[in-house]
Amino acid sequence: MKHEFAKRLAKGVLGIAAAGVFAAGVGSASAEELKVYTAIEADDLKRYAEEFNKQYPDIEIKWVRDSTGIVTAKLLAEKQNPQADIVWGLAATSLMLLKNEGMTHAYMPKGGDKLDKRFIDTANPPHWTGMDAWVAAICVNTIEAEANNLPIPTSWQDLTKPIYKGHVVMPNPNSSGTGFLDVASWLQMFGEEGGWEFLDALHQNIAWYTHSGSKPCRQAGSGETPIGVSFAYRGAKVKAKGAPIEIVIPSEGIGWDMEATAIMKGTKHLDAAKKLADFTVTREANVMYNSVYAVIAYPGIAEPVKHYPDNVAEAMIDNDFEWVASNRMRILKEWQKRYDSKSEPKS
């Protein structure tokens, strides 16, 4: 399969991705360097690397970080000349695509059998293992909503009402994993025809599309827009900083994806990559994930996350990950053709 669209996108983002390359860890001359591609939120990277280095101080993580869509496109563009040793914290649907392209190394991390089976690839041995679930949400600035006489939306369909015209921001799914899980979930919730009809109606109310899943919620928090379609993690973070936002879980249900880990086939640092994969499934790592995500892969240890909506787990749709992964490129091309005219410029 030729991923021409992914290659075109990657050409435009290589400079951005390069800017997201930085090292974290011990930094000693004897440390083995491990290039780790990720879409983990930037504010968590330092802490994640430090926790890993408590167990493996002789491995230095060199992060390459960007939004999910951009990281996925970069990996696909590098298929013939892989640069990443391992991916830690990318959408499971993206890793399924890489697996289908023969780009991942099958490996069951030590202790991986303790994870919730929904968070483990069905192949034996698996090509990826999950970490946590990130879920869609709507961030509403209550002050801006009141100033614009906007009722707090309670459903996805509410966002298509004329009263919200020009007051909604959401992520571009070609750049953002959150944007993609939104679009993929709407196509599942409303059916293929109904899903695109919903997106057509929503597009009429969109002020602009961002290239980050966090940005719509940040912009709602700062008052740049009354409503940002984002994800619950970022909503909780923004609310914790004192922003006047309400995190809405729409009544139809919410799309979600797993952050997951996969070793890249052909890595020259296989032993080090396996050590990182082993760490990612540990109880300690999952406690770390639970500091910001309410749903994690390791059963029985999750604690409530401050400012997270209470009904997240119940609202998560029955997501067909295989369908999402196999239809990813088709969905993204169609979305790009229909709606990209409102995307903000790439920075």
What positions do the PLM features span?
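Conserved C-terminal helix/tail region of periplasmic/extracytoplasmic solute-binding proteins
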Residues: 320-347
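A ligand-binding cleft/hinge motif common to bilobed small-molecule-binding domains
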Residues: 93-97, 221, 225-244
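Periplasmic-binding protein-like
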Residues: 118, 163-171, 198-203, 209-210, 241-265, 280-302, ...
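Sec/Tat signal peptide C-region and signal peptidase I cleavage site
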Residues: 25-31
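Short, polar/charged alpha-helical segment
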Residues: 35, 39-62, 76
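A bilobed periplasmic-binding-protein/Venus flytrap-type ligand-binding module shared by bacterial periplasmic
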Residues: 139-144, 183-187, 257-269, 288-289
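Extracytoplasmic ligand-binding site segments that recognize negatively charged/polar headgroups
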Residues: 39, 43-46, 69, 83-224
